[in-house]
UniProtKB/Swiss-Prot annotation:
Its EC number is 2.7.7.8. Involved in mRNA degradation. Catalyzes the phosphorolysis of single-stranded polyribonucleotides processively in the 3'- to 5'-direction. Residues 621-689 form the S1 motif domain. PANTHER family: POLYRIBONUCLEOTIDE NUCLEOTIDYLTRANSFERASE, POLYRIBONUCLEOTIDE NUCLEOTIDYLTRANSFERASE 1, MITOCHONDRIAL. This is Polyribonucleotide nucleotidyltransferase. It is an enzyme of class 2 (transferase). The gene is pnp. Residues 552-611 form the KH domain. SMART domains: KH, S1. Signal peptide: none annotated. InterPro entries: ExoRNase_PH_dom1, ExoRNase_PH_dom2, ExoRNase_PH_dom2_sf, KH_dom, KH_dom_type_1, KH_dom_type_1_sf, NA-bd_OB-fold, PNPase. Keywords: Cytoplasm, Magnesium, Metal-binding, Nucleotidyltransferase, RNA-binding, Transferase. It comes from the Bacteria.
Length: 701
């Protein structure tokens, strides 16, 4: 075993890449470390392409093992289960920048498996996983146009920070991950605290500059440790067939792509493609249908792109910077705590907001530690939204990714727990889709939160942008359609307020996109965002003053922390009785904060009264209505407050001399008593005599 090792300093950490010792039967395996966080990345590709396949089957599996953090998994089986939301998001983060680096026409199955085997809770495994994946693909011999570099960028006190750790990110106004090759940025994923466009773009450029050290180190590792390159050549296009397809379909496709209604357009495109295929098969029954489909797809792409570059109107007749017609409604459902319906052209989201207590917050136990998530956003994409039938079940990777992007867009404006002590769950149901449903979810969420009375700092809107570039000519498109998304060269989604960006996601498919092009695109996105915000603010301009009648109202009060055990009672008996008898939910915190949640105001008042009784201090000189609980020879014990008894001595029962206590009092009798003294041991001395109203003294002669 001869390990080949490369180490370099990156930000405040040392990165080490090692190959040649572990997993030697894979096409490539790299053990990558950043500090104490270590991942094993393996790459395996099938040498033979499966006949009839018309897509590139790349699978990225990212798995966090609990042993990496020195933990044993919970649950009955005590082993790792299906991927968590965080694992799914990191798998997508790795997949997005490596996919465009495989050549067109490469259809062999490739599987990348990233296993987190050791973790430092201060160093998130995502960046080192991406570096390790880039290194493993670079030395695998697969036709991979890398290496790929990656950097996380923070922004604190006006300065960019390279690869901030978990603690530094808490105070950072930016969490941006940028991946790219030596000459081009390929992917950006970020959330920010309403930062200006130039700061966001500066972060992208800074991250791309800094990651060159990663690319250089992987290039050195490749020179020493690479497997022989695969003997793969791109399939050669049949130029005669290309010309025939152009003659048969170009004019028809050009006309079809001027039909503005999506389903009608799809029908007409289908008719033209079918006619072309029939003509070609009639001429040559042996023709390869898969090749014909591929060439028709390429022609379709070329037709749309050339129209856009030539300055013609877009597929649906719009100019490049136009946003589709908007229809915005808040409060559309009667019993939900907040709701909205946001429609932009043929994209529509029905969004609901539900308020809950602290107990409803999501508790996450990951290898990075335990944390609580008070704000949840779930995105659903049913098949009917695109006029199809399909499987309905647990969320797929794409739905989890889109939900997280919308969450990032909104999170920066959410109130703190002190300002708004509720857990919030938002669900976005995509009811129609033709481009950028995730950004429709951002707009719909902002509206639904305001409708629910959540005091968000300001409205947030999102917009999806596209770019078509041919040579030096380029056109930036605002509010792209689904068709423009898959045949453009860049798609990026921007969410934000009037003041700045809260989330930015970019996926770039070509080299040569300069900082200037990105700057123009971001400025155009700003104009579109403000236009959408103006329309949204007409529907609901600020959060409702009061929450829904159907939502639980949370009332907060403070008690002496030493009294918490009195409220809980022996074995939780007191608090259990309180919640059951009043129908409220009661939460206690160590600092003496008590949160009472109920949608019934009277029930809340009753719970407050009873808690105040339990926690009240006995005051000397105060008269209480008490209840006799025990009679003894020398007096009677009287309960004056829940859990607080005092003694009325026999001499303090009446003005006259009392021989037998039972002649005056019985158990269960209610009496007025005055507190005379509370001694050092907390014993309470009471008097009925002093509490009785005094008879008027006779008037002087």
């Amino acid at each position: 075993m001869n390990p080949i090792v490369k180490s370099f300093e990156y930000g405040q950490h040392t990165v080490t890449l090692e190959t040649g010792v572990i997993a030697r039967q894979a096409d490539a395996a790299v053990l990558a470390s950043m500090g104490d966080t270590t991942v094993l990345v393996t790459v395996v590709g099938k040498k033979a392409e499966e006949p009839g396949r018309d897509f590139f089957p790349l699978t990225v599996n990212y798995q966090e093992k609990t042993y990496a953090a020195g933990k044993i998994p919970g649950g009955f089986f005590k082993r790792e289960g299906r991927p968590s939301e965080s694992e799914t998001l990191i798998a997508r983060l790795i997949d997005r920048p490596i996919r465009p680096l495989f050549p067109n026409g490469f259809k062999n199955e490739v599987q990348v498996i990233i296993t987190v085997v050791s973790v430092d809770p201060e160093i998130n495994p995502d960046i080192i996983s991406m570096i390790g994946t880039s290194a493993a693909l670079a030395i695998s011999g697969l036709p991979f146009n890398g290496p790929l570099g990656v950097a996380r960028v923070g922004y604190t006190n006006g300065e960019y920070v390279l690869n901030p750790d978990v603690t530094q990110l808490v105070d950072s106004e930016l969490d941006l991950v940028v991946a790219g090759t030596e000459g081009a940025v390929l992917m950006v994923e970020s959330e920010a605290a309403s930062l200006p466009e130039e700061v966001m773009l500066g972060g992208v450029v800074y991250g791309h500059e800094q990651q060159q050290v990663v690319i250089n180190a992987i290039s050195e590792l490749k020179a020493e440790a690479s497997k022989p390159a695969w003997d793969w050549t791109a399939p050669v296009q049949d130029q005669e067939l290309v010309a025939k397809i152009k003659d048969l379909a170009e004019a028809g496709l050009t006309e079809a792509y001027q039909i503005e209604v999506k389903q009608d357009r799809y029908t007409q495109v289908g008719v033209i493609k079918s006619a072309a295929k029939e003509a070609l098969l009639a001429e040559n029954p042996e023709a390869d249908l898969r090749e014909i489909d591929g060439l028709l797809g390429s022609l379709e792409k070329k037709v749309v792109r050339s129209r856009i570059i030539a300055g013609n109107p877009r597929i649906d007749g719009r100019e490049p910077d136009m946003v589709r017609a908007l229809n915005v409604m808040a409060g559309v459902l009667p019993r939900t705590h907040g709701s909205s319906l946001f429609t932009r052209g043929e994209t529509q989201a029905l969004v609901t907001c539900t308020l809950g207590t602290e107990r409803d917050a999501q508790k996450v136990d990951s290898i990075m530690g335990e944390y609580t998530n008070r704000f949840m956003l779930h995105y659903n994409f049913p098949p009917y939204s695109v006029g199809e039938t399909g499987f309905v079940g647990s969320p797929k990777r794409r739905e989890i990714g889109h939900g997280k992007l919308a969450w990032r867009g909104i999170n920066a404006v959410m109130p703190s727990a002190e300002e708004f002590p509720y857990s919030v769950r938002v669900v976005s149901e995509i009811t129609e889709s033709n481009g950028s449903s995730s950004m429709a979810s951002v707009c719909g969420t902002s509206l639904a939160l305001m409708d629910a009375g959540v005091p968000i700092k300001t409205s947030v809107a999102g917009i999806a942008m596209g770019l078509v570039k041919e040579g030096d000519d380029f056109v930036v498109l605002s509010d792209i359609l689904g068709d423009e998304d898959h045949l453009g060269d860049m798609d990026f989604k921007v969410a934000g307020t009037r003041d700045g960006i809260t989330a930015l996601q970019m996926d770039i498919k070509i080299e040569g996109i300069t900082k200037d092009i990105m700057q123009i695109a971001l400025q155009q996105a700003y104009g579109a965002r403000v236009h959408i915000l103006n329309v949204m603010d007409q529907a609901i301009g600020s959060h409702r003053e009061d929450i829904s009648d159907h939502a639980p109202r949370i009332t907060t009060l403070k008690i002496n922390p030493e009294k918490i055990r009195d409220v809980i009672g022996k074995g939780g008996a007191t608090i259990r009785a309180l919640t059951e008898e009043t129908g409220t939910t009661i939460e206690l915190e160590d600092d003496g904060t008590v949160k009472i949640a109920s949608s019934n105001g009277e029930a809340t008042k009753e719970a407050i009264r009873r808690i105040e009784e339990i926690t009240a201090e006995v005051e000397v000189g105060t008269v209480y209505n008490g209840k006799v609980v025990r009679i003894v020879d020398f007096g009677a014990f009287v309960t004056i407050l829940p859990g607080k008894d005092g003694l009325v001595h026999i001499s303090q029962i009446a003005e006259e001399r009392v021989a037998n206590v039972s002649d005056y009092l019985e158990v269960g009798q209610e009496v007025k008593v005055k507190v005379m003294e509370v001694d050092r041991q907390g014993r309470v001395r009471l008097s009925m005599k002093e509490a009785a109203p005094k008879a008027e003294a006779p008037a002087a002669e």
